[in-house]
């Protein structure tokens, strides 16, 4: 079970790195996958903000995991669960959202909460 949580966390971090890099390098396809469409007029500021946020978060998760700082990773995941919660509400509030675009955000919330609680519960205070 311990390995399952480890690899789920690693996959989560690596996916965030991928999503962040995609928002930085390919903003429009990333926006579509996120679940909204905005008229940017060539201004990709939102995309770059989201991209660096996800890239940074993914890198930190991977670093904490590889450094075996599981308790810190747990707190990061719990606190970070607010990000997919807000992303979910942003997509849902968009007038022409597709239900299928909500699932990745909902899954991310569940993963953050389960993984975060697991690491906090199974690691001792230092």
Question: What annotation goes with each model-predicted range?
Answer:
Residues 1-15:
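Cytosolic juxtamembrane helix and N-cap/initiation of the first transmembrane helix
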Residues 1-4, 42-45, 65-72, 96-100:
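Membrane-interfacial loop-to-transmembrane-helix junctions in polytopic alpha-helical membrane proteins
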Residues 15-46, 51:
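Hydrophobic transmembrane helix segments
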Residues 18-19, 81-89:
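Aromatic-anchored segments of alpha-helical transmembrane domains
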Residues 44-65, 79-82:
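Core segments of alpha-helical transmembrane spans in multipass integral membrane proteins
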Residues 67, 86-103, 122:
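Membrane-helix boundary connector in multi-pass membrane proteins
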Residues 71-79:
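Membrane-interfacial loop-to-transmembrane alpha-helix junctions, especially the N-terminal start
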Residues 110-126:
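Membrane-water interface at the C-terminal end of transmembrane alpha helices
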